[in-house]
C-alpha cells in the first residue's frame, strides 16, 4: 500500500488584468485566435475551479497534500490556511531565466521540483474532475506503480493541436527503448487493458515502428523519481521545453513521463472504465444527468472550441456541478 499520494493541479486566471498585462508584453507575434495553438480559450476562467476542490474533498479525502501551481495567482475564494493545501508559484519550480511562461508544457515538465512533493503523485489538469469516490488503488498499485490504460495507436497531428507534443515525446521514447523492448514491456495484450485496447494494439503490433500510445486524457499518476530520471537522460530537450514561453510544435509535454513508465514496463494496468473524456461542444440534458450519475469516477470536461450558446452552456454546467457538489469544501473561505 502506498503510504502517501499527493495531488498536483495547475491553474491560471486568464481574466486577471495583471496577468493579462504581463502576457501582452510577450504575445505580440503569437497567434491567439480560437484555432491557434495558443488560443485565448486556453486561459479562460469560468468560475468552475472550486468544484475541482469539492470533488477532491468529497471523493478523495485520503489525499495527503494538494499542490496548486500558479503564476502568482490564487482564486479569491481559496482558503490558504487549509491543512492540505500548498500554493506553489512558478518561481519555485522553473528557472527564473525562462519566466514568465504562458504554456502548460514548461510547468508540467517541472512539477517534480515542487518542494515536499511525494514520490507518488497524481497530476490533474483543471478540467479533470473527480465525480465519484476514488481510492489510492485507482491510481497506484500496492507496490507503488502508476496505473494506466493504454494501447498501441498512431498519434494524429493537427496544425494547432497537441499531437506535435506527443510525437516529440515518442521520438524520445524510441531513442531509449527498442521496438522489441516496448512490445515486451508495454503489457498491451493483457486482458486487463479491455477488449477495445487489445483490438487497437493488434492493429499496430506488426508496424515497423512504434507509432504511439493511446492516451485516455484523464489523470496522470506519476513517479517523481521517473521524472528525475528522464530529466537526467534528456536535459537539453526538457530545458528547451522549459524555456518555451508559449506552446511550440517543438515542445514535449507531461505525457513523456507516462510514456516512459509504459515503455519501461514500470506501470500497472488500470481500470478501463475509470473515466471518460467529454466536450462541452455537445453538452445537453443527457450530459448533465450523466455528470450526476456517478457512472464515471473521473471526467475530463473540456471547454470545447465550438460551444454553441456558450454562456448558457456554462450556466448549465455550473448548475449541474452545484447539484453534484452543493457544499463548500475546506479549501474555500
Swiss-Prot record:
- Kindly indicate whether the keyword Transit peptide belongs to this entry: no
Keyword Zinc-finger in annotation? no
Record's superkingdom? Answer: Bacteria
Signal sequence segment: none
List the GO biological process terms.
polysaccharide biosynthetic process
As recorded in UniProt, its EC number(s) are 2.7.-.-
This protein's UniProt keywords: Exopolysaccharide synthesis, Transferase
Q: List the Gene Ontology MF annotations in alphabetical order.
A: transferase activity, transferring phosphorus-containing groups
What more the UniProt record tells us is: The cell wall polysaccharides of some oral streptococci act as receptors for the lectin-like surface adhesins on other members of the oral biofilm community, especially type 2 fimbriated strains of Actinomyces naeslundii, allowing colonization of the human tooth surface. Recognition of these receptor polysaccharides (RPS) depends on the presence of a host-like motif, either GalNAc beta 1-3Gal (Gn) or Gal beta 1-3GalNAc (G), within the oligosaccharide repeating units of different RPS structural types. Stealth proteins are part of a protein family that is conserved from bacteria to higher eukaryotes. Family members were first identified in microbes as proteins that help pathogens to elude the host innate immune system. Microbial stealth proteins are involved in the biosynthesis of exopolysaccharides. Stealth proteins are predicted to function as hexose-1-phosphoryltransferases.
Quote the function comment for this protein.
Answer: Part of the type 2G receptor polysaccharide (RPS) biosynthesis locus. Essential for cell surface RPS production, and the host-like Gal beta 1-3GalNAc (G) motif of the RPS. Probably encodes a 1-3GalNAc alpha transferase.
* Assigned protein family: Belongs to the stealth family.
The name this protein goes by in its record: Receptor polysaccharide phosphotransferase WefF
Q: Identify the coding gene.
A: wefF
